[in-house]
Amino acid sequence: ACKDGFPTATCQHAKLVGNCKNSQKYRANCAKTCGPC
């Protein structure tokens, strides 16, 4: 059930700049890239 709602590049950038930790929006929409799936 883990998938990225945003494009992969967007999610990888979000991970790089720390948005996975800081932004609920990115956690939700980049679950595959950000999260422990």
From Swiss-Prot:
Segments forming domain ShKT: 2-37
As one GO molecular function, the record gives: potassium channel inhibitor activity
Q: What GO terms describe the biological role, i.e. biological process, of this protein?
A: envenomation resulting in negative regulation of voltage-gated potassium channel activity in another organism
- Classification via Pfam families: ShK
| Top-level taxon in the UniProt lineage | Eukaryota
Region spans: Crucial for binding to potassium channels: 25-26
Q: What is its main location?
A: secreted
> Where found, per UniProt?
Secreted; Nematocyst
Q: Name one GO cellular component term.
A: extracellular region
In this UniProt entry, which residues are annotated as the site Important for binding to potassium channels? F6, H13, S23
Q: Which cysteines are joined by disulfide bonds?
A: C2-C37, C11-C30, C20-C34
Known function: Inhibits voltage-gated potassium channels (IC(50)=14.42 nM for rKCNA1/Kv1.1, IC(50)=80.4 nM for rKCNA2/Kv1.2, IC(50)=7.76 nM for rKCNA6/Kv1.6, IC(50)=13.12 nM for hKCNA3/Kv1.3, and IC(50)=49.14 nM for insect Shaker IR). Binds the Shaker IR channels in a voltage-independent manner.
- What else is noted? No cytolytic activity on erythrocytes detected. Not active on rat KCNA4/Kv1.4 or KCNA5/Kv1.5 channels.
Q: Which family does it belong to?
A: Belongs to the sea anemone type 1 potassium channel toxin family. Type 1b subfamily.
Protein name in the entry: Kappa-actitoxin-Bcs3b
Question: To which species is this protein native?
Answer: Bunodosoma caissarum
* Organism classification: Eukaryota, Metazoa, Cnidaria, Anthozoa, Hexacorallia
